[in-house]
Amino acid sequence: MRFFFLLLTVALFLTSITGDDAERMLGMKEGGYVREDCGSDCAPCGGECCCEPNSCIDGTCHHESSPN
Protein backbone atom coordinates (compact mmCIF):
# COMPACT_ATOMS: atom_id res chain seq x y z
CA MET A 1 0.00 0.00 0.00
CA ARG A 2 2.88 2.37 0.75
CA PHE A 3 4.30 1.73 -2.71
CA PHE A 4 0.99 2.79 -4.26
CA PHE A 5 1.03 6.09 -2.37
CA LEU A 6 4.66 6.68 -3.28
CA LEU A 7 3.86 6.06 -6.93
CA LEU A 8 0.84 8.36 -6.71
CA THR A 9 2.95 11.10 -5.10
CA VAL A 10 5.59 10.86 -7.82
CA ALA A 11 2.90 10.92 -10.53
CA LEU A 12 1.27 13.99 -8.99
CA PHE A 13 4.64 15.73 -8.73
CA LEU A 14 5.42 15.06 -12.39
CA THR A 15 2.00 16.22 -13.53
CA SER A 16 2.29 19.37 -11.43
CA ILE A 17 5.01 20.59 -13.78
CA THR A 18 3.08 22.50 -16.40
CA GLY A 19 3.63 23.53 -19.98
CA ASP A 20 5.32 22.22 -23.08
CA ASP A 21 8.67 21.87 -21.31
CA ALA A 22 7.24 19.24 -18.98
CA GLU A 23 5.69 17.35 -21.87
CA ARG A 24 8.99 17.40 -23.73
CA MET A 25 10.94 16.40 -20.63
CA LEU A 26 8.63 13.48 -19.97
CA GLY A 27 8.59 12.48 -23.62
CA MET A 28 4.83 12.87 -23.88
CA LYS A 29 4.79 15.48 -26.62
CA GLU A 30 4.67 13.91 -30.05
CA GLY A 31 8.13 14.01 -31.53
CA GLY A 32 9.50 15.86 -28.51
CA TYR A 33 9.78 19.05 -30.53
CA VAL A 34 7.46 21.32 -32.43
CA ARG A 35 8.38 22.77 -35.81
CA GLU A 36 9.16 26.19 -34.28
CA ASP A 37 11.86 24.59 -32.12
CA CYS A 38 13.64 23.03 -35.07
CA GLY A 39 14.10 25.90 -37.49
CA SER A 40 13.14 26.43 -41.11
CA ASP A 41 15.03 23.57 -42.78
CA CYS A 42 14.42 21.05 -40.00
CA ALA A 43 11.45 19.02 -38.82
CA PRO A 44 10.53 17.22 -35.59
CA CYS A 45 11.33 13.54 -35.88
CA GLY A 46 11.10 11.02 -33.03
CA GLY A 47 12.21 13.37 -30.26
CA GLU A 48 14.90 15.22 -32.17
CA CYS A 49 15.15 17.81 -34.91
CA CYS A 50 15.91 16.19 -38.23
CA CYS A 51 17.57 18.69 -40.57
CA GLU A 52 18.43 18.58 -44.26
CA PRO A 53 19.97 16.53 -45.81
CA ASN A 54 18.86 13.96 -43.21
CA SER A 55 15.52 12.24 -43.64
CA CYS A 56 12.86 11.19 -41.14
CA ILE A 57 11.76 7.59 -41.68
CA ASP A 58 9.26 5.99 -39.27
CA GLY A 59 10.07 8.47 -36.49
CA THR A 60 13.85 8.03 -36.77
CA CYS A 61 16.18 10.63 -38.20
CA HIS A 62 18.49 8.92 -40.66
CA HIS A 63 21.71 10.91 -40.76
CA GLU A 64 23.14 11.21 -44.22
CA SER A 65 26.89 11.09 -43.80
CA SER A 66 29.89 9.84 -45.70
CA PRO A 67 29.59 6.17 -46.75
CA ASN A 68 30.87 3.70 -44.18
Swiss-Prot record:
Cystine pairs: 38-49, 42-51, 45-56, 50-61
Domain of life: Eukaryota
Expression tissues: Expressed by the venom duct.
In-chain residues carrying the UniProt-annotated modification 4-hydroxyproline: 44
A GO cellular component entry from the record: extracellular region
The entry's keywords: Disulfide bond, Hydroxylation, Secreted, Signal
Signal peptide region: 1-29
KW Cytoplasm (keyword) present: no
Compartment annotation: Secreted
Propeptide span(s): 30-35
Domain note: Displays a mini-granulin fold, a structure composed of two short, stacked beta-hairpins connected by two parallel disulfide bonds. This newly described fold is derived from the same cysteine connectivity as knottins (ICK fold). The name 'mini-granulin fold' comes from the structural homology with the N-terminal region of the human granulin.
Family as reported in the entry's similarity comment: Belongs to the conotoxin G2 superfamily. 1 family.
Function description: This peptide promotes cell proliferation (EC(50)=17.85 uM) and inhibits apoptosis (EC(50)=2.2 uM).
Extra facts: Negative results: this peptide does not show activities on voltage-gated sodium (Nav) and calcium (Cav) channels as well as on nicotinic acetylcholine receptors (nAChRs) (at concentrations up to 100 uM).
Name this protein carries in UniProt: Conotoxin phi-MiXXVIIB
Species annotation: Conus miles
Phylogenetic classification of the source organism: Eukaryota, Metazoa, Spiralia, Lophotrochozoa, Mollusca
